[in-house]
Amino acid sequence: MIRLVIAEDQALVLGAIASLLALEADLDIVGRAADGAEALDLALKLAPDVLLTDIEMPHLSGLDVAAQLMAAQSPVKVLIVTTFGRAGYLRRAIDAGVGGYLLKDSQADRLADAIRRVAAGLRVIDPEIAAAAAFAPADPLTDRERAVLRLADEGRSNKEIGRALSLSPGTVRNYLAEAGAKLGAANRIEASRIARDHGWL
């Protein structure tokens, strides 16, 4: 029996995925999470074989959850199921130790098979995303530039970003300028859009 935690912030989608997977005799859904922080907590407490998670969720992204599980040396394997087929997300997922990456439009039997394969220690990647990632540019941003851009993308001021990241407003301005230059962006809004479109945020 494969023990599974499902993390998805849209209640209807969470219910649909859980209902489909409940039909599989060898899959046991031991927990459901509505955001990234809850997903991380359940994964650490329940130690399922597989955490099935979306990427973009409140509090922590699925990529952040995967990275924290890897940092904690957790044996929980992570399978990302998302609407975002961005090559940058796939690269970050692989760097975070994710075992699988599928799009939400995958067939139910393909999803169940991917869970089994990831639980067995194999890697499963949607072929379309893998092909796109092979030719996509590498992420030029540092972790700090990405964190600053992420908060700028939420509409926060330099002062608010500085408070959140323990940086001075001048340092925030420098990180935004460096990120903008790397991305060829005229301003912070354009830099955020470019980074988001590539899956780097």
Give the location of each predicted region:
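Active-site residues of response regulator receiver
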Residues: D54, T82
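Recognition helix of helix-turn-helix DNA-binding domains
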Residues: G155-E190
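The feature encodes the CheY-like receiver
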Residues: V13, R32, P58
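Short hydrophobic/Thr-rich beta-strand motif most characteristic of the beta2 strand and flanking loop
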Residues: D26-A34, L42, A185
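Short, flexible helix-to-coil linker/hinge segments that flank and couple to helix-turn-helix
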Residues: G88-A147, W200
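Short amphipathic alpha-helix used as the core "switch/output" element in two-component signaling
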Residues: D41, L63-P75
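Acidic catalytic/metal-coordinating carboxylates
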Residues: D35-E38, H59-V65
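Active-site beta3 strand of CheY-like receiver
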Residues: L46-L52
